[in-house]
């Protein structure tokens, strides 16, 4: 069963610049490791209530695309959930395998609009209690591209088991996805609740961050 929206993640060009940006939002590093075989640095940051996964490859690649590019969900039955979603006709990206970190197993598929979705089964837990000492009080949502809103709603609501908390927003665990019909990229932006009004920002790889008033 899929039981948690765990993180949003992607590939970063300059790891230290990205860490500095999120540090300015009050984020804290909750996990950091180096995958020697692939020469990839992986960092999990917690931004208030939500996790952001940053992946930095030591080798340069002129063909690489940088920025947030997937949402990750936790499951207690990776093989079963993956097979079920494949039988429903969703696009295969990579079948279940041992994670490069050695921490559990993972698989990737695409939602109806081409957004990369990671399924994870592992015992490690990186999330810590909410970090609210900085300007950001919560990760309100991850905005994902949804030109076909109805198909996306069926995927996230019916087939991933997320709770529909608004017409365009689905929650599972602490975090939520918001469906954006006119998104500029697969992960359109992060919606963060903040103590003070602030202009929209961009991280070093061009990911948009929208600040929302805290309740």
Where are these regions (language model features)?
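N-terminal beta-strand motif that seeds the catalytic metal site of vicinal oxygen chelate
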Residues: 1-16, 68-73, 120-153, 159, ...
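N-terminal accessory/assembly segment that mediates macromolecular interactions
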Residues: 44-51, 55-103, 109
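Core segments of cupin and vicinal oxygen chelate
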Residues: 2-3, 10-51, 80, 87, ...
């Amino acid at each position: 069963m899929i039981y948690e929206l765990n993180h949003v993640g992607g590939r970063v060009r300059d790891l230290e610049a990205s860490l500095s940006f999120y540090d300015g939002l009050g984020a804290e590093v909750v996990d950091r490791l180096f995958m020697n075989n692939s020469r990839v640095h992986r960092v999990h940051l917690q931004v208030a209530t939500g996790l952001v996964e940053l992946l930095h490859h030591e080798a340069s690649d002129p063909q690489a695309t940088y920025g947030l590019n997937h949402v990750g969900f936790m499951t207690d039955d990776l093989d079963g959930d993956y097979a079920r979603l494949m039988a429903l006709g969703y696009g295969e990206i990579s079948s279940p395998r041992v994670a490069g970190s050695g921490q559990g197993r993972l698989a990737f598929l695409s939602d109806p609009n081409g957004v990369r979705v990671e399924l994870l089964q592992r015992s490690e837990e990186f999330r810590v209690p909410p970090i609210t000492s900085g300007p950001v009080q919560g990760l309100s949502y991850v905005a994902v591209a949804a030109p076909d809103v109805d198909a996306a709603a069926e995927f996230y609501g019916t087939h991933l088991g997320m709770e529909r908390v608004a017409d365009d927003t689905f929650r599972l665990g602490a975090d939520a996805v918001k469906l954006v019909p006119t998104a500029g990229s697969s992960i359109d932006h992060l919606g963060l609740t903040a103590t003070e009004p602030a202009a929209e920002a961009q991280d070093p790889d061009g990911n948009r961050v929208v600040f929302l008033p805290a309740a």
